[in-house]
Every structure is written in C-alpha cells, then in structure tokens.
Amino acid sequence: DSQGKMMPALAKSVDVTDNGIQYNFTIRDDVFWSDGKSITADDLVQFFREILTEENEDDIEALMNVYGARSYLNNEGNFKETVAIWAEGNNLIIRLNSIDDDFLVQLSKPQYRLRKNVLSWEFINNNYTSLVYSGDYYISSMDENQIILHRNEKSNTDIPKVLSIIEDKSEDIALAAFEVGNRDIVVNPPRNQLQRLKEEGKLITLPSNKAVYASFNLDECAIPINGRKKVYSLLDSA
C-alpha cells in the first residue's frame, strides 16, 4: 500500500512452515483473470513453470532458491517431478532450498505478476487485446502516448471504471496539465515542486529501489479514495 506494507492480492493467507523454507498460499476464491475466468492454484504453478523456463535467471532470482529449480534448468528432470512448486486443491505450495526472509517481498515485484503466455508479452503493442492476466483492469487501447485501462466486470465497483495513462513530453508539461485539472495523478513531478506539493498535501512517496513520487489532484471530481488506494498498488508494482 502507500505505506509500503505488504498487502494480500491473490492469496487470502500464507503459512510458512518447516523452519521457514516451505510456503503455503491459500488462493482466494474471488480472484479472476482478465477474461473473467477464475484463477486457480494450478494456474499459478503453470505460470511459475513458464517464467522459470523463459525468463533470465537474473530477473527471477527468488525462484533460483526454489528446491529443484536449477536442476530443472540443467535438464535434470521435468518441472512436475523436479521443481518444488505444486498445487493441492486451491493451495499453492513452494519449497525453498534455504530460508529467504525476503521471498514474499521479491514475489511482489512486477516480473511475478500473474499472466498467461509469458512470451507473448514481448509483443504487447500488437497483441494486447488477446493477452490474459490478473488484476482489476484490462488494456482496452494503447498507442505510443497513452494506455486506456478498463475495470474488469468482476472487480470492485468502488474503484474507477477507466484509467488513462498518458506519457507527457516533460515533467513540466505533466504538472501544468495537473494544475489545471487535466490530470488526476502525476508520477515524478519536477523536483523543484516537491516541497510545495507536499505542503499542499498532494504528494506521496512510494518505497522502491529508486524514489518514486506521485502527486494527486484533490478535487472532489477526481479519483475517490478507494480508487487512489488501487492506484497506489498499481504504481508500487510498476
């Protein structure tokens, strides 16, 4: 969230057992793919198999500590019989080689966002309409300067129905549009304006590997509080 606290997304609970090396995620029954189908623990197993197979090791370091992961990548067995990631009913279980206190934090990073057909995302500009992924929004249109997100039918109706992500030519242009009410949120406004925005109660700072600032328009017609909370999580995972 906006305070940097870990919040549940797909799982309603996580139990850590066996001296800290086994994680049991109980998957919620109210989480859905962007096409409206329910997300299951088996879906997550398939996703982890895909990214372990297709992604660079440096990008998925957390999975390199999963029991059997390196053996699988060295062609020493198939995924199901070698890698300690499996489903039991609607529970996803992951067993590590050794304790990793940062494991859950690592899994919250963007590269672990649940999606189908991982390789297809390399060509997102051409096939975004056919991509399937988790989350409250789906991409309805996109071009070089703008992405339009629409709320999924089964998502919470308290969050905004449509989000427009616009790439302005400069920080100053973005802030100017914000000041006249044409932007609800500006990410990384000009540094010389940070103190003023903070004093006006319009600035939040998100924890990250590098500093990320966001300025929120406080107009009553702008994004409501529940919508802001959702945007916090989207920005934090970007």
Label each PLM-derived region with a short phrase.
Residues 204-238:
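Periplasmic-binding protein-like
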